Amino acid sequence: VVFTFFVPPIPGCEDVRQLTPNDEKKKFLEAYGIDYLIEYPFTEKVRHTAPKDFIREILCKKLCAAFVAAGPDFCFGYERKGNVALLEKMSSLCGYEFEVFDKVSYKGEPISSSRIRACISEGQMEDACEMLDRPFSLSGTVIHGKAIGHTIGFATMNLVWPEDKLLVPIGVYLSKVKIGGNTYQAITNVGHRPTVEKDAAKSDLLLEAHLLQYSQMAYGEEIEVSLFHYERPEVRFSGLDALKEQLKKDTLACVTYFEERGNDGKKEGFVEERA
């Protein structure tokens, strides 16, 4: 059982963009074998709950917790005054077992959500992937675009960037896209399409993924896009011919990247997973 607070997203508020929004969190926890997820409403009353009251009223009375585990830096209760020392002290009084998880390090420093967020915000996708134990990804329904990619041989699957999802630097990423049980290598642009948009700065932030070795229509389909490597910034090209030539270079970079790295260091083809 995993206990977490549910904080409703606030549209348009950059401060609440999440590394893993609620829907994604549920999917990942299920994949990791978690049986139950408790999303406790984070109301004003809960926010002002004293640490000891949180343990007695929520952990013990409402959840009937028999075993509690937390990281060494875990804080809770009003003004974050509760800590693992208090959880340990109250365990005998409230009848639960308590264990502190050890910190996990990467490149000699402890892994934390703030460190992962910083890596993603700076485009350091490989480091983020290592610390997350998975690539940074997002899911959504494919929407219609302007179909300009079709005219130059680089059709894309388009997603609007979710309002509650942590932003990545604008640019082109070497990626993988999962659709219909299969996973394909892809070049993915996250940005405002300055080559084809007259007023790009005011356009929606769009994710455009060109899948290698995939040519079917996917409008209305659910896809998952995983960003493995930040390749280059988004550029305004002189025209579609120049854009096409750059996309050819990006495609070669994508193929080379995954040939060298693959999954677990193994070379693999374009289609890697089947349902």
Locations of regions flagged by a protein language model:
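Short, solvent-exposed coil/turn elements at secondary-structure transition points
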Residues: 6-8, 43, 104-106, 215, ...
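Classical nucleotidyltransferase
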Residues: 48-155, 178, 238-242, 268
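Conserved beta-strand segments of alpha/beta enzyme cores
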Residues: 35-36, 97-99, 224
